[in-house]
């Protein structure tokens, strides 16, 4: 539909949402496969297919890599910034490689890249929605409940301070050990933090 209205508006579509969601719920490999599939299919429907595929592949891979380093939900803004900068650098390099004049750069392209990056932030509420709909738990949720400021852990610290300190020590040890063998250190930490939560009563 967008292609029929204005082909250049295809750059407004936040295709990076799909690989971001796949990376958060599954892993990098699934995210990359899904993104490749979407880009190749859409590449056959838009004008300048090679340019479109090149833009989307590079930007999608950068978004997947950026998501890997999540430590909190606010990092979505960092991913959006990475997406904007990647689009902008690819476009700028492509134009300047053909024309030596900076005046050949189109300002509306950068505005499209910015809108695209902002729309990518819709992935945040979508993650929350999918977690609730399908009962899935992501690393982002684990990060939230691993905070010692959660009501359950605060009550444990207040009513059983010795047990709380024990849980903290086990959590730190578990996180280090699981990291060494390449497992999900965050999941191990959360499990260790709450393994004695029953002692609140």
Language model regions located:
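Hydrophobic alpha-helical scaffolding
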Residues: 4-11, 30, 48-52, 67, ...
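A generic alpha-helix surface/boundary motif
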Residues: 15-16, 60, 168-172
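Acidic/His-rich, divalent-metal-binding segments that scaffold phosphate/diphosphate chemistry
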Residues: 35-37, 79-94, 107-201
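Short helix-perturbing small/polar motifs within transmembrane alpha-helices
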Residues: 1-6, 19-102
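Proline-rich intrinsically disordered, low-complexity coils
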Residues: 7, 14, 18-19, 47, ...
